[in-house]
Amino acid sequence: MASPAKKVVKKKKEKKNIPNGVAHIQATFNNTIITITDPAGNVVAWSSAGGKGFKGSRKSTPFAAQVAAEDCAKKAQDHGMRSVEVYVKGPGSGRESALRALQAAGFHVNFIRDVTPIPHNGCRPPKRRRV
């Protein structure tokens, strides 16, 4: 006879009091991912355009990035966060709108830094599209 399925006990997320943190905005051509961490790098909140219900080419729009940033900011503010340092990575269209959404949500932005990786002539890029 098969043993009964064990119940998985999920730990309840405790509310940490983190006054300042780091917001990482990764804006690719297909999606925008926002992650807010504490200064040590431990993730406090995250959200993405695809996770907020946008599919296909709508994930890469500035509006989708704005919705994802608002959601992530709300989660982080539940932990008592008030000010962030912003690191922006990638060439996507959601860069500016995600940043504006974080500011509109009530965060005090200490500084904004572009950390897009630029190759020193590394890998060959994909060939140009012919439509």
UniProtKB/Swiss-Prot annotation:
GO cellular component: ribonucleoprotein complex; ribosome
Molecular function as annotated in GO: rRNA binding; structural constituent of ribosome
Oxidoreductase as UniProt keyword: no
Superkingdom of origin: Bacteria
Ranges in coiled-coil conformation: none
Transmembrane segments: none
UniProt entry keywords in alphabetical sequence: Ribonucleoprotein, Ribosomal protein, RNA-binding, rRNA-binding
A Gene Ontology BP annotation from the UniProt entry: translation
Function statement: Located on the platform of the 30S subunit, it bridges several disparate RNA helices of the 16S rRNA. Forms part of the Shine-Dalgarno cleft in the 70S ribosome.
Subunit structure: Part of the 30S ribosomal subunit. Interacts with proteins S7 and S18. Binds to IF-3.
Family per record: Belongs to the universal ribosomal protein uS11 family.
Name this protein carries in UniProt: Small ribosomal subunit protein uS11
Organism whose genome encodes this protein: Geobacter metallireducens (strain ATCC 53774 / DSM 7210 / GS-15)
Gene name of the encoded protein: rpsK
